[in-house]
Regions:
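Formylglycine-dependent sulfatase
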Residues: 3-18, 22-472, 476, 485-508, ...
Length: 562
């Protein structure tokens, strides 16, 4: 074991032992899929939108009720399974890393959003959905938002994807930084830096250097080629290219003897929401967010229609979901969540996301599911459906652990959900900021609870990344998510209904989780930003711990912020 990280694992276990909480290691996922062994393996398509709210779709109580009809996703839900207790992560990069790797983001180091020019990204040692499925004979394709780094080794075509087309590397608003019409007060030297380091839409096959197809900016412009050279495509038009790449790939591979896996990632509905001109004013509410929601729904519908048209729908598993909870900090250019908290918090509003699974003839129509599932479970589930065993070593030959459960028994009605818990992490948390076991939730990280008044008699706004860091002093808040999904009533100590006894369960689960960090240490963070000062006394205490560990042969870097 690498001594540099072994020390971190020991400290993690110690911290986990001190916190009241709980967890379990992921189950062994070796089951074969539901299809006949002699039949062609199913195609698998993962469609991910960005920042879509839990309450935006009609099937979740939104749709026309929110002034933004979603007939295509609602049809997908009516023909498949809708999940009501599905979890992403509190922000885009960890949410996408969790889906792609099947690992808690702090294990891969993909814990927070990076800015352009920072380099790095998803470690080359990690397995992805694509690299695992390729071991089972799948062709693999990626298009749209990646957000897992900009170094060549971290790009989709170096992470198991045979081909990538029109890949966006950053959060959507990053493409406005260099635009003087957006930020006329920006220092010219800083603007020049953003112009220089921001990579545009990338395409390329595995083993090839990526090609920049066009630049991306925050204007209503669609000139991908100018005088035979790369041009510029504005944010409003980007998802046109993602849809086109998807439809072209389906056309080209519909009759292939090999199964395929597609990862399709729309930029909608991340702020700034700038709808394609074809969809401006097409929602009932006429807002930019609602128009963008109608656009995203239509593009998903076009992909689903193509599957039916090509006659491959009966042998294709499609999963649609989003990366994280609604970003209430940027209201009104944001999705809606009925839950407490927002993107960037350990509250339900930060991580609970909409999700739909569809496979005609395999998944029962109009299924409604309330089991604990999440984006982490895609890895084990897709591997199971494809008849593949998950690897026990990473791509560099070192032992690896997944936190992914095979939920195919849930999809196909053949068994119960193997997952009984969920752990919530924000940014660089090594131990969970919150934990759910069954229908009870313990909250240790109170970020987002001190929102500023929005005016009049309005409720407090939810401050996610903008809010102060705050942890409970000794005991967590306890919520019953069946009776109180909005986390309004702390039942830890409240007269005869007190639930202090739940600490035993949470302690057991979190301690079990943290023990795995000793055997499988986390990778170093792949992106870090200054998050505030540390005090001299904190620095001195850490220095003393560091010196003691050095005597035992362990190395720890000094901290730079809280």
């Amino acid at each position: 074991m690498n001594k540099k990280y072994k020390g971190i694992g020991v400290l993690a276990f110690a911290a986990g032992s001190l916190l009241p909480g709980a967890t379990a290691n992921a189950a062994d996922q070796n089951a074969a899929g539901p299809s006949d062994g002699a039949a062609k393996k199913p195609n698998i398509i993962l469609i991910v939108s960005d920042d879509t709210g839990y309450g935006d779709l009609g099937v979740y109580g939104g749709g026309e009720g929110r002034g933004m009809p979603t007939p295509n996703l609602d049809r997908m839900a009516d023909e498949g399974m809708t999940f009501f207790d599905c979890y992403g992560q509190p922000s885009s990069t960890p949410g996408r890393a969790a889906m792609q790797t099947g690992r808690i983001p702090n294990r891969s180091g993909m814990t927070t959003v990076a800015f352009q020019g920072q380099g790095g990204g998803l470690p080359k040692e990690e397995w992805t959905l694509a690299s695992v499925l390729k071991t089972g004979g799948y062709k693999t394709f990626f298009t749209g938002k990646w957000h897992l780094g900009e170094a060549d080794y971290a790009l989709p075509n170096a992470q198991g994807y045979d081909e990538m087309k029109y890949v966006g590397l950053y959060h959507l608003n990053a493409y406005t930084y260099a635009d003087p019409t957006w930020f006329p007060d920006m220092d010219p030297q800083l603007r020049e830096m953003f112009t220089r380091v921001t990579r545009g839409a990338l395409s390329g096959k595995a083993g090839e250097a990526p090609k920049e197809e066009f630049k991306i900016n925050g204007q209503y412009v669609n000139t991908p080629v100018v005088d035979g050279k790369e041009g510029v495509v504005g944010i409003p038009f980007f998802d046109r290219y993602v849809e086109k790449a998807s439809l072209d790939y389906l056309e080209a591979n519909a009759k292939s003897s090999e199964p395929f896996f597609m990862s399709i990632n729309f930029m909608k509905n991340h702020q700034p929401n700038m709808p394609d001109p074809d969809y401006v004013g097409k929602s009932m509410s006429k807002s930019k967010y609602a128009d963008s929601m109608v656009e995203m729904d239509a593009r998903v519908g076009h992909i689903m229609d193509k599957l039916r048209e090509l006659g491959i729908d009966k042998n294709t598993l499609v999963v649609w979901t989003t990366d994280n909870g609604a970003w209430q900090d940027v209201y009104p250019d944001a999705g809606y969540t009925p839950f407490r908290g927002t993107k960037g918090t350990d509250r339900e509003g930060g991580s609970r996301v909409p999700a739909i699974a569809w496979w005609p003839g395999k998944i029962k129509e109009h299924s409604r599911n309330h089991d604990i599932v999440g984006g982490l479970d895609l890895m084990a589930t897709f591997a199971s459906v494809a008849g593949i065993k998950l690897p026990t070593k990473d791509r560099a030959g070192q032992p690896i652990i997944f936190y992914s459960y095979d939920i195919s028994p849930v999809l196909f009605g053949t068994g119960k959900d193997p997952r009984t818990s969920w752990f919530y992490f924000t940014e660089n948390e090594l131990t969970p900021g919150a934990a759910r076991v069954g229908h009870y939730k313990a909250v240790f990280n109170l970020r987002g609870d001190n929102g500023a008044k929005t005016g009049g008699l309005a409720v407090d706004s939810n401050l996610g990344w903008k809010g102060p860091e705050s942890y409970v002093a000794t005991v967590p808040q306890i919520f019953d998510l069946w009776q109180d999904p909005q986390e309004r009533y702390d039942i830890f100590m409240n007269n005869y209904t007190e639930h202090t006894w739940t600490l035993v369960t949470f302690n057991e689960a979190i301690t079990k989780l943290m023990k795995t960090y000793v055997e499988y240490p986390p990778r170093k963070p792949q992106s870090e930003a200054y998050s505030g000062p540390i005090t001299l006394s904190q620095y001195q205490r850490f220095s003393n711990i560091r010196e003691q560990l050095q005597k035992e042969g362990f190395q720890l870097a000094m901290p730079t912020g809280n």
